[in-house]
């Protein structure tokens, strides 16, 4: 988690791996009980899990999920990484580098001492398997939290099809979509500093 604007940088960008919840729910509850405003962002199942853990609503909690494709098996990621790179030599990983645009994104592995590995979606075996649902977690295939059922205040998504709906807003680096799902979200939204079109 982060309590600073500068800390948000590490949380940005797509991460096509399973996240570790660890003590996140406990930290969230502690912050909420102290009266701090908490924005919890996670997969739909993580939002649902947090709500079950908390067992009550908090006015100072804002929950955000995203349209989730599913989560790949951590074992597959580990195998891929071990075959592709020495993990102690990795500087940064980008699962969705947009140098070629958001419709033809690339997997980029930056090393500390050697040339970076850059492969498009069509060439990278890890991304291909993920996009084609070959190695998602078994629970993802029967997810009960997808389709706006997690109880989140907001849902984020890529605005695929914007070329057809709002062609004048199209951007080769992508456009995001924000959906308000709850009354709490409707109350919060006017106070948010968001650039965009409603």
Where on the chain are the PLM-derived regions?
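Iron-sulfur-associated redox domains of electron-transfer enzymes in respiratory
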Residues: 1-198
């Amino acid at each position: 988690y982060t309590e600073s604007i500068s800390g948000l940088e590490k949380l940005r960008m797509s991460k096509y791996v399973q996240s570790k919840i660890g003590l996140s729910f406990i930290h969230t509850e502690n912050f909420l009980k102290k009266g701090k405003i908490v924005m919890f962002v996670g997969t739909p199942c993580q939002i649902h899990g947090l709500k079950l853990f908390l067992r009550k609503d908090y006015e100072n909690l804002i929950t955000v999920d995203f349209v989730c494709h599913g989560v790949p098996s951590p074992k597959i990621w580990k195998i891929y990484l071990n075959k592709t790179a020495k993990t102690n030599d990795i500087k940064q990983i980008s699962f969705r580098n947009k140098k070629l645009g958001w419709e033809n994104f690339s997997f980029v592995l930056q090393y500390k001492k050697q040339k970076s590995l850059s492969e498009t979606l069509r060439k990278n075996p890890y991304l291909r398997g993920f996009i084609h649902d070959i190695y998602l977690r078994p629970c993802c295939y029967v997810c009960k939290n997808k389709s706006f059922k997690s109880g989140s205040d907001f849902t984020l998504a890529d605005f695929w099809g914007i070329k057809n709906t709002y062609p004048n807003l199209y951007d080769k680096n992508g456009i995001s979509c924000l959906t308000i799902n709850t009354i709490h979200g409707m109350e919060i939204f006017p106070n948010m500093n968001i650039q965009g079109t409603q």
